[in-house]
Every structure is written in structure tokens, then in C-alpha cells.
């Protein structure tokens, strides 16, 4: 089982790249985001690898980060009807943090922006992964957890009121949730809505 490739980038194609390791070329299929982040051919490259084995095929999928690979696994192993091609399309359209945000907020429209992902598939992704998003949110896990509470309507009243107030001021729901999450760290978990709004506006002014 191959978990990582470290070698020289030989070439980049539309949906894959070729990595040379001591004279052996490895083809790794990648998301558009990973391909865009690759260095120029001839330079050193490191890819996190998921080895996909079927009766008639062995294929390597490459990712620029371990977190992106974890999301690929999450989509592939937990959402019926989502194969490798669709999972890569999703990760080409949404960065892991954006995907976690969309799932936490139950933003079907955001998830369905990926090619090949219709409304039904997007709904299935949100339903199947809503409880897993915070654990796979990377550094933004606290913010994702708050957004999940907002999406489920179970966030404490001061938080809900603060987010609503910022939205009424013209900020997007996602931006408002980020600001309030940051405000919570400064103002404390027991802060009232007015304090969260005040600290949230300070965050937005930075």
C-alpha cells in the first residue's frame, strides 16, 4: 500500500501527474486544486496517496495535504453513490475547510456546485457527513462546530442573535459565523449577544 510519493515531478496532465522516483514513474490522479498547487516539472514534489484497488484496476490518487486525502476517504467510504471521480470533483471545487463549512451549515447549493453533484447527491453528502465535519475541519474545527449548531438550530441564543445581527448589517452568514466564533474566544463562552456583536465587528474590521 502506497501512502506517500516523494520524488521529481515529471509531467502534469489534465487530471493527473507523473512523479519520477529513482527512474520509476508513478501516475497519480489529483483534484484540480492539487494539480494547480504542484511545482513546475523537474522540481521536487510530495503527494499524499490513496491507493484504490479493484479487481481490474489499481489507481493512485494524490493530494497536496493529508486533510484533503481524509476528505476523499470520507466521501468515498461514507456517502452512497459517490465514487472517486465525484469525490475529486468536489475537492476540485471546494477546499476541505469550505466543504466542512458547507456541510456544517447544510448549504446544499454550495456542495452542488461541484460538477456531477446534483441536489440529491449534495443532500446525501450533507446528511451522511454532518456529524463528521467538525472532526475533519482541520484548524477551523471550533468554528465548524459552531456552524453546525447554527445549521441545526441548537446554538445558544446569544450566538444566534449575534450572527443574525451581523447578517442584518450586510455580512454573509458564513462571514458572520466566522466573526462570532472568533469573538467567542475573546469574549468568553458566557458573553451576551451585544458583547459578541461588538467583538465580532472588531474581528470584521481587521
From Swiss-Prot:
Region (Domain I): 1-64
Predominant location: cytoplasm
Organism superkingdom: Bacteria
Region of interest called Flexible linker, as start-end residue ranges on this chain: 145-154
Keywords: Cytoplasm, DNA damage, DNA recombination, DNA repair, DNA-binding
Pfam families: HHH_5 (PF14520), RuvA_C (PF07499), RuvA_N (PF01330)
Gene Ontology cellular-component annotations: cytoplasm; Holliday junction helicase complex; Holliday junction resolvase complex
Region (Domain II): 65-144
Gene: ruvA
Entry similarity comment: Belongs to the RuvA family.
GO BP field: DNA recombination; DNA repair
Domain notes: Has three domains with a flexible linker between the domains II and III and assumes an 'L' shape. Domain III is highly mobile and contacts RuvB.
Gene3D superfamilies: 5' to 3' exonuclease, C-terminal subdomain (1.10.150.20), DNA helicase RuvA subunit, C-terminal domain (1.10.8.10), Nucleic acid-binding proteins (2.40.50.140)
UniProt name for this protein: Holliday junction branch migration complex subunit RuvA
NCBIfam families listed in its UniProt record: ruvA
Subcellular location field: Cytoplasm
InterPro entries reported for this sequence: DNA_helicase_Holl-junc_RuvA_I (IPR013849), NA-bd_OB-fold (IPR012340), RuvA (IPR000085), RuvA_2-like (IPR010994), RuvA_C (IPR011114), RuvA_C_sf (IPR036267)
Region annotation Domain III: where it falls in the sequence: 154-206
Cited function: The RuvA-RuvB-RuvC complex processes Holliday junction (HJ) DNA during genetic recombination and DNA repair, while the RuvA-RuvB complex plays an important role in the rescue of blocked DNA replication forks via replication fork reversal (RFR). RuvA specifically binds to HJ cruciform DNA, conferring on it an open structure. The RuvB hexamer acts as an ATP-dependent pump, pulling dsDNA into and through the RuvAB complex. HJ branch migration allows RuvC to scan DNA until it finds its consensus sequence, where it cleaves and resolves the cruciform DNA.
Gene Ontology MF: a single term: four-way junction helicase activity
Subunit-structure text: Homotetramer. Forms an RuvA(8)-RuvB(12)-Holliday junction (HJ) complex. HJ DNA is sandwiched between 2 RuvA tetramers; dsDNA enters through RuvA and exits via RuvB. An RuvB hexamer assembles on each DNA strand where it exits the tetramer. Each RuvB hexamer is contacted by two RuvA subunits (via domain III) on 2 adjacent RuvB subunits; this complex drives branch migration. In the full resolvosome a probable DNA-RuvA(4)-RuvB(12)-RuvC(2) complex forms which resolves the HJ.
